[in-house]
Amino acid sequence: MDQKSLLFTPEGVRDIYGEDCEKRAKIQQGIHTIMKQYGFKNIQTPTFEFFDIFNRERGTVKSADMFKFFDQYNNTLVLRPDITPSIARCVAKYYEKEEMQIRLCYTGSTFTRLSGYQGKLSEITQLGAEMMNDASSDADGEIIAMTIECLQKSGLKEFKVDIGHADIFRGLIEETDLYEEEIETLKTYLNNKNIFAVEDMLENRDMPQECKNLLVKMPDLFGGIETITYVKEQTTNKRALKALERLEKIYEILAASGLEDHITFDLGLLSHYEYYTGVIFKAYTYGTGDAIVTGGRYDNLDRKSVV
């Protein structure tokens, strides 16, 4: 490369300087202040880890989307594509015998290959918080309430937090005869709101009609608390009903704090990360096509109850 070319950054990364850098620092500081007020303690994990921390069995990003390399012992290492699995590993190591609630927060870069995605970055800054050893709906509600406060602290006035539950889809899928590969295809159709493809896929499958009807309607199961009431009347699946009752409790918690205007329920919400086992949420605001916040409960990643 010539000297002039060395002034540029590789594709997918960028320099942040001047006013933009100052704004980012101010926003990060404000969010960190809210997290500290909620009792969260700082934690730092390595920028790269062993590949197995993020492999497919643990429900993170696809192997092809990771930046991988080898150490001198021929171990496969990756630049972290997500910080949550790193936190889970750290907690399993240092807090294995801890039974009391644990609250941890962090800031760091994540790295994902995004070939084919125009305008998206491979390196992004991730700010997050993890609450361990608390399986209650109160914990779910508190994390979402803190998310709303963090967004308000960032200066956002118009935003919505969409809330769903992983067990609604999983409960309905239990009643089907779909194979794992077919389930992944169905999830893609649902994420793309492709109702016609969903109908075509399920047309001649062996499953209860109520289950088929709800799966087809999933992309439209979006709205206020009345959406939960509607779906409860349409299914007898115990796993899905338990998830819906959980969402009702979360609504009551948030409504008691006057935060109900900031939330909607998306009962067809499916997460990119497979490790989520319970409540899932994403926050959106005007001018961005993607979620500005993603989160949820994962009780299997480190054998602890976490949101």
PLM features: residue spans?
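Beta-rich nucleic-acid/ligand-interaction surfaces
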Residues: 47-64, 164-175, 269-277
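Positively charged, Gly/Ser-enriched RNA/tRNA-binding surfaces
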Residues: 20-38, 49-50, 69, 73, ...
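Extended alpha-helical scaffolds
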Residues: 154, 167-169, 182
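Short, surface-exposed recognition loops or helix-turn segments adjacent to catalytic cores
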Residues: 158-168, 186, 264-268
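TRNA-binding/sensing appendages of the translation machinery
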Residues: 1-85, 141, 162
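A local structural micro-motif
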Residues: 41-43, 159, 181, 262
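Acidic, His- and aromatic-enriched active-site or binding-groove loops in soluble protein domains
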Residues: 65-71, 177-200, 207, 259
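Phosphate-rich ligand and nucleic-acid binding surfaces
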Residues: 15, 174-177
